[in-house]
């Protein structure tokens, strides 16, 4: 299993001005001994070429890569056309950043505040993701939503969207146990679409079940260790990561009869 630790896991430190993306790269590489960066876009200082290329240089110097770019404030759908346009422009900026940084996957939310989708919303969302997929294909990464909030927290909406977009560079960021409908079955229904994952602290008691599900569907991406509390983040992330990794190692040992 490959692991990543989203920079969002340190959003408390970031809000206090105690960590930026350069410090995050150091933290992931030398505190947690990972080569994978998992960037939350709200930690970008700008989209200027000079800044983004400095980030890329910092990654290359540490022999790191970007497993995922997690994009907020760029949701595809909003009922307000002006906000839709604003989010679209932000989405394009982040896709360009993903290309410069060499990201493997990009999460851009579906938007929509309710589980129900109008025909207008669905058609617009499908077409926008098709556009994003064309860019992703050109630059060698996957793109799609997370079951994060609103419309995306219904596995049936995810299924319909995946089938309608119908593109090899489209998939989802699967946030375990984060559904408003089909709460018991959502992960199982949508795991096959996943290109990246978020495993929160509250899912740790069921970590073995989630890891088994990923193996069952042939998942090749990273297990993203996302922490949310904003408190004692270095130690909390260390516990969460170590527990998930130990669970996986015990599962593999059991298979070998060790």
Question: Where are the language model's segments positioned?
Answer:
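Short histidine/acidic/glycine/proline-rich micro-motifs that form metal-
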Residues: 11-12, 41-46, 73-76, 112-115, ...
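N-terminal substrate-binding region of glycoside hydrolase catalytic domains
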Residues: 28-46
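Aromatic- and glycine-enriched glycan-recognition loops and surfaces
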Residues: 19, 43-52, 86
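A short, structure-level motif marking secondary-structure boundaries and short turns
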Residues: 9-11, 39-41, 78-80, 116-118, ...
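N-terminal small/glycine-rich loop or linker at the start of catalytic domains
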Residues: 1-13, 66-78, 111-113
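Active-site acidic/histidine proton-transfer and metal-coordination neighborhood
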Residues: 16, 26, 53, 58-65, ...
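Conserved beta-strand positions in the central sheet of alpha/beta enzyme cores
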Residues: 36-38, 68-70, 107, 144, ...
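Histidine-acidic metal/acid-base catalytic patches
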Residues: 1-33, 60, 102, 151-174, ...
């Amino acid at each position: 299993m490959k692991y990543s630790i989203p920079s969002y896991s340190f959003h408390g430190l970031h809000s206090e001005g105690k960590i930026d993306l350069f410090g995050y790269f150091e933290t992931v590489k030398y505190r947690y001994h990972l080569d994978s960066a998992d960037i939350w876009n709200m930690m970008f200082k700008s989209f200027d070429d000079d800044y983004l290329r400095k980030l890329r240089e910092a990654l290359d110097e540490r022999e790191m890569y970007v497993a995922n770019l997690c994009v907020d404030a760029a949701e595809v759908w909003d009922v307000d056309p002006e906000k839709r346009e604003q989010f679209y422009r932000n989405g394009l900026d982040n896709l360009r950043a993903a290309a410069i940084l060499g990201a493997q996957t990009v999460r851009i939310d579906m938007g929509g505040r309710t589980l129900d989708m109008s025909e207008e919303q669905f058609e617009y969302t499908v077409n926008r993701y098709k556009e994003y997929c064309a860019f992703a294909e050109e630059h060698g990464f996957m793109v799609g939503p997370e079951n994060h909030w609103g419309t995306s927290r219904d596995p049936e909406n995810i299924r319909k969207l995946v089938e309608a977009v119908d593109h090899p560079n489209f998939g989802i960021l699967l946030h375990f146990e984060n559904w408003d409908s089909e709460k018991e079955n959502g992960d199982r229904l949508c795991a096959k679409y996943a290109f990246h994952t978020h495993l929160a602290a509250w899912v740790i008691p069921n970590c073995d079940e989630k890891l088994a599900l990923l193996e069952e569907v042939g998942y090749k991406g990273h297990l993203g260790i996302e922490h949310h509390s904003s408190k004692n983040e270095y130690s909390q992330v260390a516990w969460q990561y170590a527990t998930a990794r130990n669970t996986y190692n015990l599962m593999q040992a059991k298979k070998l009869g060790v």
